[in-house]
Amino acid sequence: MSQGIITKVSGPLVVAEGLPEAKMFDVVKVGNQGLIGEIIEIRGERVSIQVYEETSGLGPGDPVVSTGEPLSVELGPGMLEGIFDGIQRPLDVIEKKVGSFITRGIDVPSLNREKKWKFTPKVKSGDKVSGGDIIGTVQETVIVEHRIMVPPAISGIVEDIREGEYTVTEPIARIKTDSGQIVEITMMQKWPVRKARPYKEKLPPEIPMPTGQRVIDTLFPVTKGGTACIPGPFGSGKTVVQHQLAKWADAEIVVYIGCGERGNEMTDVLLEFPELKDPKTEEPLMKRTVLIANTSNMPVAAREASIYTGITIAEYFRDMGYSVALMADSTSRWAEALREMSGRLEEMPGEEGYPAYLARRLAEFYERAGRVICLGSDNREGALTVVGAVSPPGGDLSEPVTQATLRVVKVFWALDSELAYARHFPAINWLTSYSLYSDVVEDYMNKNVSSDWGELRSEAMRLLQEEASLQEIVRLVGIDALSTRDRLVLEVARSIREDFLHQNAFHEVDTYSSMEKQYRMLKLIMIFYQEAQKALEKGVPFSEIEKHPVREKIARAKYVEESKLTVFDEIEKEIKKAMQGLIEGGAADA
């Protein structure tokens, strides 16, 4: 370990000299308290260090010690149900040690060193293994089996492997490599956060990831291994959408990063998730979740690390063959941390003061998502889906972080303050949002749910767009100037908005809709539209169609439980019968 001295302190940036062997992104201990920092620039003898803790009290002449290792995370049993800070320090352990506020220079291991885990081998002595092969399993929580893998760079013959209870640092197996060297394998691996974990092959993201949110799954779907962003102004519901995705997305593991957001939002997650049951296993959602809390009152520099820490943990679970969903809330705070460090380094600023390399850093982050064939001889598939929230100041979507994000992600869920103020949630604007996965998902849904899924979706989108243009006319000349056909379009589009797209995140039934239920709900509205068109053609007055009591049954369909979807068949019959009754009644009057 080489030791240098501080020459300058500027907020979270410390400049030091006397570290000749230092490398980029090495971790250093700064000052007498040993604050954790990372080298982000080397110029001759001088190194610039971003410190992940409060730097008040540091001054020129204080010592700096280089560890010679990059910032890494510990990967192994004990991460699930855990809550960590941006550099993977367990907050519950710190709280027991020093109380509610994190003191500076505290050094605690990320994974519990005392707890013993029951290890069950999957290979035997004499078997040949290579990087990524699963050599055994640990039942980490009731619903997640933690698969212990050979580190990527190691291959050889298993010399010795034993079943039993071990801590994460005790050897569970010995492998004789091709060069004759004996390597001891533990349940814990260390991995540098800025380096993507390797895989065999990247696959096209073709399988949809149901989220239970109707506006997302039907109109703007995301796939397993896809990328999505949620930009929106303050108060438009970004965090609630992220929480909904974390709760109900069809993923086996969820990694939730609270990056520079309010602390009470992480508290909500900590209080809600243990109470909520996973619909597939009926176990608490917390048992498949890893939380990284880097709230707005924590040091700014650690925000940058938190995003990398989270995605490295997510990649590790992906390598086991799991489908993983990563929520980053919010990437704007991360970009602001980049901007602050760039300013302190006196780099040339780009647009709005952000560094010129902002787009590259964002692309590198989203590039780590994907559906892959993992390393290992069993060719297992894993997927990592990334959903990033963006908080543009004043909801201005033309600002650099939103624009750089839109260049790399395939799904854009635009949150609208007007919809939010009108209490329409989720406030995803159906006219400006898009999904580049919709064609792939449409093929999948046509095969697996119903052959007319694609037609229903296209018709619903057409009606919503037609409604927007008709509303312009209504504002100018009033609704009475419209033909009855146009008034029906407005009425059906309103039904799509209020009875289908609007969803209550806090209602026990409406919070989640299966793909089957979403299809049945949309089909009801479209059957009403078709039957009402026939009634209009036969001369039935529009006012009678509009006021018919069957409309209320369509509106209440969202509260039908998943186990009672046969109710939709009855409502379909009622709609047809009601419209037929209006036609026959009109004919009798004539």
Curated annotation (Swiss-Prot):
Q: Which GO terms describe its molecular function?
A: ATP binding; ATP hydrolysis activity; proton-transporting ATP synthase activity, rotational mechanism; proton-transporting ATPase activity, rotational mechanism
Q: What class of enzyme is it?
A: translocase
Q: Which reaction does it catalyse?
A: ATP + H2O + 4 H(+)(in) = ADP + phosphate + 5 H(+)(out)
GO biological process terms on file: proton motive force-driven plasma membrane ATP synthesis
The protein's UniProt keywords, in alphabetical order, are: ATP synthesis, ATP-binding, Hydrogen ion transport, Ion transport, Nucleotide-binding, Translocase, Transport
Report residues binding ATP: G232, P233, F234, G235, S236, G237, K238, T239
Reported EC number(s) for this entry are 7.1.2.2
Q: Does the keyword Transcription regulation apply?
A: no
Which GO terms of the cellular component aspect does the record hold?
proton-transporting ATP synthase complex; proton-transporting two-sector ATPase complex, catalytic domain
SUPFAM superfamilies under this entry? C-terminal domain of alpha and beta subunits of F1 ATP synthase, N-terminal domain of alpha and beta subunits of F1 ATP synthase, P-loop containing nucleoside triphosphate hydrolases
Q: What NCBIfam families does UniProt report for this protein, alphabetically? A: ATP_syn_A_arch, PRK04192.1
Q: Family per UniProt? A: Belongs to the ATPase alpha/beta chains family.
Q: What does this protein do?
A: Produces ATP from ADP in the presence of a proton gradient across the membrane. The V-type alpha chain is a catalytic subunit.
Q: What is this protein called?
A: V-type ATP synthase alpha chain
The organism named in the record is Thermoanaerobacter pseudethanolicus (strain ATCC 33223 / 39E) (Clostridium thermohydrosulfuricum)
> Top-down, what is the taxonomic lineage of the species of origin?
Bacteria, Bacillati, Bacillota, Clostridia, Thermoanaerobacterales
Q: Which gene encodes it?
A: atpA
